[in-house]
Amino acid sequence: TMQAGDTEAAIPFTIDFNDIAGNVGTQVTGLTSGSSITYDETVPTLTTVSIASNNSEGATLATVNNIITLSIVADENIQTPTITIAGNAAAIATGSNGETSYTATYTMASTDAAAAPIAFTVDFKDMANNDGAQAVALVNDLDGGVTFDKQAPSFTTVSIASNNATNTLAKVGNVVTITLASDE
């Protein structure tokens, strides 16, 4: 049984044996396949966790039907992670079991809550089943989070006036001013 603090490496072993007649067999110190079992107690970590949107106005903005991409890089090979974006299961777009880099995507829906920033989770473990700490924050992402805004803007005030003595009329040389106030 492996114990915490044991050396992380290929596990050495020897097998000494005899047959029922007492003949000593050749000592075995390795698997006939040439493979080995490696002891690993180190918890994996994520060195990069970044998020972006495909919104044409910028990677930190999202609206309904925008695709959110979460990218991660681990410090060692990990099993395919479980990723949520805005509380929904994200589809793994790149990376396969036993790699260090993965991307996951989710298309924002009208049923998703507006958020600034969009929340996410990344659950992952290394190939030896050591659980990494759930990621809920960005790591080495220079842009910051993505804001999901699903509300269309509207004007709360729209007015027009001229600098004519009667501000509802205009003639050549008068300046017409339109004043708009938006809800966002």
Q: Where are each of the predicted segments found?
A:
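Flexible, low-complexity linkers/stalks enriched in Thr/Pro that connect modular domains
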Residues: 29-49, 136-158
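Tandem-repeat architecture and repeat-register "anchor" residues
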Residues: 14, 20, 42, 49-52, ...
